[in-house]
Amino acid sequence: MRRLVLSAVVLLVAESLGAQAPIKTIEDGALDKIQLFVASIDQPADVMVVIKPFDASGADLGTGGKDGKEARQQEAATMKNEGPRVLAERFVATLEKGPFKGVRALKAEEAVPDGALVVEGKFVTIDPGSRAKRYFAGFGAGKSSVKVTGSVKDATGRTLATFEQRRIGTMGMGGGDSLGKLMSDAKSIGEDIGKFLARWARRESLD
């Protein structure tokens, strides 16, 4: 009897894990990595999309960490505060013309509207890089980077897709403005995610 119970538990766990397996994985396409758990979004014209503020609290700050220069730490701290906002704003702007019924950014504690698709995620990396290396070593050295991971869920909390996206900035021989590039990259990532969602909803290629 005990063996039968254990077998049943193992079977249930296996079925549960199988149900979570993506039906398709796409790398270096619309985003760096996309895992789809459903083939498409049904009737997007009737669907509201919301984006929650991406969590930046656990991001790897690179040269903006506690051992970095004060200027880099300040840039990283500013990005932790402002990055989620500018990402969400660009995401919303990208989808305002469709194909969804509507799109808006939620505040941190705001409730999700009934029936809405939810985009949420976190900043994995917010690295200002090294301005000195960019200045003296030139192209490719001391590059800054911003990376996020996230998911798209339906109103019941079921995961429809997961994604990863990273933007890297070198800024050339002059060294460049690390904070300006980080903010620009956060906006670009918001746009990238919005375009991915639009292409997926329109059943266009994500490769």
Predicted regions located by residue number:
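Surface-exposed short loop/turn segments
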Residues: A21-I23, G98, L106-R158, T170-D177
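A structural motif corresponding to the C-terminal end of an alpha-helix
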Residues: L87-R104, A155
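N-terminal signal peptide c-region/cleavage motif recognized by signal peptidases
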Residues: A14-S16
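Short secondary-structure boundary motifs at beta->alpha junctions and helix caps
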Residues: E70-T78, A141, K153-R203
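A structural "domain/chain start" motif
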Residues: G18-E89, R166, K195-D207
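Sec-exported extracytoplasmic/periplasmic mature domains
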Residues: V92-F100, P128, G194, A198-R202
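Positively charged n-region of N-terminal signal peptides that target proteins for export
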Residues: M1-L4
